[in-house]
């Protein structure tokens, strides 16, 4: 890992009016996307890796020895998309093959932080599920957490704190070791390391877990849960429960808010931010196309949204690909992107002193 990098010349607001994206090539635009001081709130650390890193893990542990590198990527990942969130979850469970020991988990955390830094992210909230990382090889969640915290801390310090990183804990559904209550207890035990609590995996109505989420929130840990992502669900109950029962401050994805004026009004009134993951939504068939992605409607309606990469390892993308897609297909401007990042900063669960520092530096 080559830490020595040219510092990024981040964009200032006063520069934006002098930049004409329409006259630029795609390569030139990517240089601009990198210079946006990005605040990313929704990225699964356990699914954040490069193709090279993933293949090296598969080879290291002699998994799938009869498959070529390209076949390995096709077998495990979701870069070509699929039929649904359910199909994605099944593939993600396969990816847990690489969580063989604590060394690879620490390495994954290091690479994830460094890659986000190279992409121009200045505030990064990673989230991970202790039970998901642990279940395949029956690892100890305490040692998993130690490895992740150690890996993050080491790279953040090597980068002289030019990227600020925090963790959210996920209690999930969809794999054999999933246990929301155990994950909530783990989150509160390590409250010094976790800035928020989430639910991920299969999208379910969480009202039956109200007691657990109340317990976490009342202990001082804010909530953001996955809801309003899965278009195969017959109604919008997951969103209503997240907002009215769980009292979340943010929603992971939330794009189905666009289907209801009542929900649009509700998230605006309660100042709830939607952590939108554009490429993820298209690849999982939760948005029919980028041209018709609901983020445009939501943004125009005054809903606070932010741009996120979700599971970049599964998609073989990075956060700047999401910016390129939103510009190319939905005509979002640099001013729009700066505003979204200001919203993300405002709604981040990180310490207010760090947020103030980032605001003064970049916004």
Swiss-Prot record:
Give the protein's cofactors.
Zn(2+)
Q: What switches its activity on or off, per the activity regulation note?
A: Inhibited by coformycin and methylthiocoformycin (MT-coformycin).
Q: List the EC numbers from the record.
A: 3.5.4.4, 3.5.4.31
Q: Does the keyword Secreted apply?
A: no
Q: What class of enzyme is it?
A: hydrolase
Q: Where is this region: Gating helix loop?
A: 170-184
Which N-terminal residues, if any, form the signal peptide? none
Could you give a single Gene Ontology term from the biological process aspect? inosine biosynthetic process
UniProt keyword list: Hydrolase, Metal-binding, Purine salvage, Zinc
Which InterPro entries does the protein's record reference? A/AMP_deam_AS, A_deaminase_dom, Ado/ade_deaminase, Metal_Hydrolase
Top-rank taxon: Eukaryota
Cellular component, GO annotation? cytosol; external side of plasma membrane
Q: Which residues bind Zn(2+)?
A: 42, 44, 226, 310
Free-text cofactor note = Binds 1 zinc ion per subunit.
Where does the entry annotate site (Important for substrate specificity for S-methyl-5'-thioadenosine)? 172
Which residues does the annotation say bind a purine D-ribonucleoside?
Answer: 44-46, 172, 201, 229, 253, 310
The pathway to which it is assigned is:
Purine metabolism; purine nucleoside salvage
Is Thylakoid one of the keywords UniProt gives this record?
A: no
Mind listing the GO molecular function terms for this protein? 5'-methylthioadenosine deaminase activity; adenosine deaminase activity; metal ion binding
Provide the reaction this enzyme catalyses: adenosine + H2O + H(+) = inosine + NH4(+); S-methyl-5'-thioadenosine + H2O + H(+) = S-methyl-5'-thioinosine + NH4(+)
Described by its record, this protein's role is as follows: Catalyzes the hydrolytic deamination of adenosine to produce inosine. Unlike mammalian adenosine deaminases, also catalyzes the deamination of 5'-methylthioadenosine (MTA), a by-product of polyamine biosynthesis, to produce 5'-methylthioinosine (MTI). Plays an essential role in the purine salvage pathway which allows the parasite to use host cell purines for the synthesis of nucleic acids.
Q: Which protein family is named in the record?
A: Belongs to the metallo-dependent hydrolases superfamily. Adenosine and AMP deaminases family.
Protein name, UniProt field: Adenosine deaminase
The record lists the organism as Plasmodium vivax (strain Salvador I)
């Amino acid at each position: 890992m080559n830490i020595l990098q040219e510092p990024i010349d981040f964009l200032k607001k006063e520069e934006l009016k002098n930049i004409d994206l329409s006259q630029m090539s795609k390569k030139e635009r990517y240089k601009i996307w990198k210079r946006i001081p990005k605040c990313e709130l929704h990225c699964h650390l356990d699914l954040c890796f490069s193709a090279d890193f993933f293949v090296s893990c598969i080879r290291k542990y002699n998994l799938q020895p009869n498959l070529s590198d390209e076949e390995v990527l096709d077998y495990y990942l979701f870069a070509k998309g699929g039929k649904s969130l359910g199909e994605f979850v099944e593939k993600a469970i396969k990816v847990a093959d690489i969580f063989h020991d604590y060394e690879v988990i620490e390495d994954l955390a290091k690479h994830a932080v460094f890659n986000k830094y190279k992409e121009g992210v200045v505030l990064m909230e990673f989230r991970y599920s202790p039970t998901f990382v642990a279940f395949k090889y029956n690892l100890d969640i305490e040692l998993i957490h130690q490895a992740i915290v150690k890996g993050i801390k080491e790279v953040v310090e090597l980068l002289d704190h030019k990227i600020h990183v925090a963790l959210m804990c996920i209690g999930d559904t969809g794999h054999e070791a999933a246990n929301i209550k155990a994950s909530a207890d783990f989150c509160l035990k390590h409250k010094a390391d976790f800035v928020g609590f989430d639910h991920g995996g299969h999208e379910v109505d969480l009202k039956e877990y109200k007691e657990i989420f109340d317990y976490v929130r009342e202990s001082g840990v804010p909530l953001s849960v996955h809801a309003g992502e899965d278009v195969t669900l017959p109604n919008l109950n997951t969103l209503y429960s997240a907002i009215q029962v769980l009292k979340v401050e943010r929603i992971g994805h939330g794009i189905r808010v666009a289907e209801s004026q009542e929900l649009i009004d509700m998230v605006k009134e309660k100042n709830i931010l939607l952590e939108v993951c554009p490429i993820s939504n298209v690849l999982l068939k939760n948005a029919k196309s980028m041209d018709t992605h609901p983020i445009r409607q939501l943004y125009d309606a005054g809903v606070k949204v932010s741009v996120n990469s979700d599971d970049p390892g599964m998609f073989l993308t990075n956060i700047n690909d999401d910016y390129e897609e939103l510009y190319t297909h939905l005509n979002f401007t640099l001013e729009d992107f700066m505003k979204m990042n200001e919203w993300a900063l405002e709604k981040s669960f990180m310490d207010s002193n760090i947020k103030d520092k980032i605001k003064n530096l970049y916004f």
